[in-house]
Regions:
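Helix-loop junctions and terminal segments of transmembrane helices
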Residues: 97, 101-137, 144, 191-196
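Membrane-proximal transmembrane or re-entrant/amphipathic helices at the cytosolic face
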Residues: 278-313
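Transmembrane helix-bundle signature of multi-pass secondary active exporters and lipid flippases
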Residues: 67, 79, 89, 94-113, ...
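Helix-terminus/linker motif at the lipid-water interface of multi-pass membrane proteins
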Residues: 2-4, 8, 65-103, 121, ...
Length: 313
């Protein structure tokens, strides 16, 4: 699709077909790996087990539904709260900025997939989870803050490369929206930890809180600020949910707050911002060079400020 190999007009259906094909290939590959490691198996219905499985899975399904609601309400409310034509246009502006956030969030999501079985096993065996939590926090804080700062300072060049129209409007929304990566990354750590601990009731409460906050702020800001209002609502919601889950995890699992890590985070952000600004200013016409050099310098800076300990190497 990206290679522009077709001579006919581009169709949105091509994206649907390619994504469906990608899912199918992934599913078949996963099935092949399972069969190779487990051998042949026969499918059959065990209704008592099926009933127990549904009962135990229901809280997880509710949690996923609630999280999906406060993550996706913004674009829907933009179309519904604004006049016809304006709503669709502003939803498009919001979506153009959201696509990059949706892409970079995948790294944090992969962390949560790895952390869930790890946390579950350690909690079951009554092992000390603090080192793993701290390491995950340091890595994802480094990743999220670095990506946010570098993308914000190079936003105009990136959006000019990705889009032909409405670049200025998207760039105004993007810095607010991409900052959501930081609280989302924290949610993927501490929400996963609470899930492994079995605190689904608390997680569902924080997700309900997120829905109410998101709807309330959207109702207030969208009529005045349009797409920027929706971005502010999203950032506010993610931040409130993240802090709620961090507080609940620290309280439930008695995780100590280490001042050294907090100071490292502050020093890293304080030094990263001027470095990223200087790099983007000097290589303003070579965005990929700016991102590469900024990434290398941020990696060195993370060890210099001890945000990432040398033991990680």
């Amino acid at each position: 699709l990206w290679g522009n190999t077709s001579i006919s007009a581009f169709k949105i259906e091509w994206f649907i077909a390619s994504q469906t094909l990608a899912y199918l290939i992934t599913a078949l590959l996963a099935l092949f790996i399972v069969l190779r490691n487990s051998g042949a198996f026969r499918l059959y219905w065990n209704f008592p087990f099926f009933k127990v499985l549904l009962k135990r899975s229901f809280p997880f399904a509710i949690l996923y539904l609630l999280m999906a609601c406060y993550n996706r309400f913004d674009s829907v409310m933009l179309e519904r709260l604004l006049p016809e034509g304006v709503g669709a246009y502003q939803a498009g502006i919001y979506a153009s900025a959201f696509r990059l956030l949706d892409a970079v969030v995948m790294i944090a999501y992969l962390f949560s997939v790895i952390l869930l079985p790890l946390f579950s096993k350690m909690l079951k065996n009554r092992e000390n989870i603090v080192p793993i939590v701290e390491s995950a926090f340091q890595l994802l804080f480094y990743y999220s803050t670095t990506v946010v700062v570098l993308l914000i300072f190079n936003a105009e060049a990136i959006f000019s490369f990705l889009y032909d129209h409405h670049v200025a409007e998207s760039v105004r929304v993007f810095p607010i929206l991409i900052t959501c990566l930081i609280p989302i990354s924290m949610i993927y750590i501490f929400g996963t930890l609470l899930t492994a601990y079995g605190s689904l009731r608390l997680l569902n409460i924080t997700s309900l809180l997120g829905i109410f906050v998101n709807i309330g702020i959207n109702f207030f800001l969208i009529p005045h600020l349009h797409a920027r209002g929706a971005a502010i609502a999203s950032l506010s919601t993610q931040t409130i949910v993240a802090f709620s889950q961090i507080y609940l995890a620290f309280r439930a699992l008695h995780i100590p707050l280490r001042k050294k890590i907090c100071l490292s985070c502050v020093f890293y952000i304080t030094l990263l911002i001027p470095i990223a600004y200087g790099v983007s200013y000097y290589w303003d016409e070579k965005v990929w060079v700016a991102l590469l050099i900024g990434g290398v310098l941020s990696f060195i800076l993370a060890f210099f400020t001890q945000l990432l300990p040398f033991s990680f190497i």
